[in-house]
Amino acid sequence: VLIIAVLFLTACQLIATASYARSERKHPDLRLSSRNSKLSKRCLGSGELCVRDTSCCSMSCTNNICF
């Protein structure tokens, strides 16, 4: 019984891995666009409107303006 359970779980993992790889091949543009959006984010320059310190290049957001 234990051997059958191990074989069943192994088969489930292989099926899940194969379907994940297939979906990545079907939609490579989605993967690239999400990767590019992460790379294209920039910090805000001095004088630009901000919400928090981490969005400013200087890490200083006072009264919603980067310094």
UniProtKB/Swiss-Prot annotation:
User: Pfam families, from UniProt?
Assistant: Conotoxin
Q: Which InterPro entries does the entry mention?
A: Conotoxin
Location comes to: Secreted
Q: Which GO terms describe its molecular function?
A: ion channel inhibitor activity; toxin activity
State which tissues express it.
Expressed by the venom duct.
Prosequence residues removed at maturation: 18-40
Question: What domain of life is recorded for the organism?
Answer: Eukaryota
Q: Quote the cellular component terms of the Gene Ontology held in the record.
A: extracellular region
Q: Where is the signal peptide?
A: 1-17
Q: Does the entry annotate any disulfide bonds, and if so which pairs?
A: C43-C57, C50-C61, C56-C66
Keywords annotated in UniProt: Cleavage on pair of basic residues, Disulfide bond, Knottin, Secreted, Signal, Toxin
Family membership: Belongs to the conotoxin O1 superfamily.
Q: What is known of its domains?
A: The presence of a 'disulfide through disulfide knot' structurally defines this protein as a knottin.
Q: What is this protein called?
A: Conotoxin AbVIM
Which source organism does the UniProt entry give?
Conus abbreviatus
